[in-house]
Amino acid sequence: MSEEEVHDTSSEASEVFTNQPNAFVRGVRSIFGYRKTSLTLFVILTIVVTAGLSFYDNSLELTIELPTSQLEKEILESSWLDLQNIARYPHTYGSRANDQVHDYLEEIIQDMEYDNDGEKIMFESGKGVVSYYESNNLLVRVNGSDGTLPALLLSAHYDSVPSSFGVTDDGMGVASLLGVLRFVAHNQPRRTIIFNFNNNEEFGLFGAHAFVKHPWFKQVGYFLNLEGTGAGGKAVLFRGTDYGIVKNFGGVRYPYATSIFQQGFNNHVIHSETDYKVYKEAGLRGLDLAFYKPRDKYHTGEDNIRNVSPKSLWHMMSNAIDFVQMGVVDDSEEPAVYTTFLGYFFATPISALARVNLVLLVLFPVVSTPLLFVIVKYKKWKLRVTNFLGVPLAMGLAVAVGQVGNPMLVSSHPMMVVATTTSIVVLVYYVVLNGVDWVNTSSDQKLVTMIEVSFVYWVVLVYVTWSGGDHTGEFGVTVLFFVQASTSLLGLIGWTFTRVRGGDEPLLSGEEERYGTEDERDTEKPLVEHNYDWSLQYLLIVPVSSLVVYNSGWLVLEGVNKTVQESLASEHLIYWIVVVFSQFLVLPVVPFITKFNRYIVLGLSVVAVVGVLMSMAVHPFNQGSPMKLRFIERVGQNDMVEVYGRQGFVEDVLSDLPSVKQTQAKLECEALPDGLEVCKYKSGLTPGNLTVEVTTEPRAESYGLISGAITIAAPENRMCTVHFPPDRVKAVVVGKFGNNFKAIPDGFSREKGNYIYKDRNGISQLELYKLDWNKDYHVGFEWLPDIDDEGGMRVEVECFWGDMVPAYQEVVHYSPNWVTWANKERGLVGVVKHVDV
């Protein structure tokens, strides 16, 4: 070799050596280059950060601090003691313990300005249902420094259901009111505050209805209702009447809110109601602050002091203390969209969000369509129909995997169900999109997929915007569409700067390398084609979208997953939520899914297989997440215990009861509509000293109608119901019986101490609630006789008691630890009598 040749070779080697990138550059390329290993790292980090932030945001222990000031410490200690005393026993309206709670509260407030509300009300509480109620609310008024401001009502109910100690529902609300009362006793508020410790919320919101008739109601402009539909945890802002009042919640120290639950009420996904409904319908503006999970302990004996903590109580109480110090309320009365994250509160009128949505819906198609035209026509981006088949095909197949195995499993293992479903959805997308990628010649299938996902979000956003004010919980769709569409738009803009093949590559190249197995082919392309734009696209789309979807979806699922026990319709709804949740969790990573490496695919396959197998093998209920059964014992012609629950579970529980085995009682199980069943049996454990006597009074005929009356004697009783044949009874009266029904006006009226209600469409049921334990009920009514009878009418009377039920004590004591019990009716036992009038 000549000296010149040696010199040239040395020069070339030196040039190659000097052109080698340094360690930093190689590190950046290995992390941000579009390689399977890089994507795996990004995905793992996204999962860890998303789950970690969501866990922190929803954690009571990590986000709420106990008070440090001496006054607030004393208030919390006193209120916690109040809660322990209030929830010592179940204290339903029909129990003596209810009177004890009333007297306990009255003793605390006796030195303040208060009124032992004795309103008697009568109103139509449902279609064909009329209710008569005697109230014993406790009202307290603390006058503010500015008498020109409308008063603020704070409300909580001190009754429980007969099957629960009522700690969360609503002992913590009552204890929080007492805490606020002690606070304002030391710090005069600016506006007058009226406290309504109301009774009998559980069976018809009666305490709230009674307050609306009280003279103090006229002072009130705003309200804060404190409730509980779970058992401890964090108190969430369930709903607000309007933006003007909702935005004041941003001033509390520990805001925790989402308008998703508000939409759940508006769309009737959440069926239970609170006093909020009464106050809103009466024209007040306010908020509903409540504990919301877990619902399988709601209204059961598990709603007890052991399952809550002072920190839960302090969360509700401290926010109430802060809220009562609000200043002037904005006049805006349109629905509000609101949420919190990491303690930061955000609220906006629904109209403002709608305007943003309209701009986004119009702007992105208008901008992206010309760009797409230019790219395809002048930049030679080759697209085929097959490019656009992947996402819709995979989405359709993924919907089919909504329910895996045991349908009840979501009640106790929601994370397992979501993880299994999501893993299967990811695998479906992975297989389908890799197939599409294999047959396509497109040089940027990733951007095509981004555009398709953007279109999916666009369609959803159109629906959300068109639906209007009832859809205040779908604000996350705006965020999802914005980040996805913006990133797609950036990709299209990058393509417009791409030179036709043979030219120089742009800074944001649309070119995407083809790859083989694992990472070896990721390094085969020249350095100019490392494609770092994918990391920017990933960071713009996936972290924000994943956090929005995961945090919102998990909040919804934790709030409603227990309702799968309530009906087949609820089961279908829950699994629809799971499928939608999984789809939206996966959509942000769909553009990058073909780059998943073998370890992610293997891990997802293991999760899917193990999840499916466990869903078939694991019992759906356990001590921590029990099944709820509902109990009522009816005493009358056929003394029977009735237990209601989902089909397939009730008989096994009851067959092991001692009274059933010893008496060889026959279990009679009957399938009910919507996936429920009722099992009945005769119990030897009959309650004692429960008597109902019904006597009739003379009747009279007038203008074709017949008037009659009955007297109901039910010692130690507060609650009875009179059932009439459908559509025949046109008027009812509680009090003295009279014959002048023709002169009675439609609706409610009061005459000489009698409470009268007339409805020409017919009254099928009259509910009676009284305070005097031993006073008889006197009920008159007017009815229209059938053509084929002699004018008589059979009336059924059922009176309820909330205690003294040995059969209920037996089922609680001997049932498995994965079962909890709740009341089916207003009491645990009902005594039934029939009388011909």
From Swiss-Prot:
Molecular function terms, GO-annotated: metal ion binding; metalloexopeptidase activity
Site residues by UniProt (Transition state stabilizer): Y298
Cellular location(s): Vacuole membrane
Listed SUPFAM superfamilies: Zn-dependent exopeptidases (SSF53187)
Known cofactor(s): Zn(2+)
Note accompanying the cofactor annotation: Binds 2 Zn(2+) ions per subunit.
All ranges on the Cytoplasmic side of the membrane: 1-36, 377-384, 437-446, 496-539, 594-598
Residues spanning the membrane: 37-57, 356-376, 385-405, 416-436, 447-467, 475-495, 540-560, 573-593, 599-619
A GO cellular-component term linked to this record: vacuolar membrane
Enzyme Commission number, as recorded: 3.4.-.-
Domain of life per record: Eukaryota
Similarity remark: Belongs to the peptidase M28 family.
Protein name per its UniProtKB record: Vacuolar membrane protease
Organism for this UniProt entry: Candida albicans (strain WO-1)
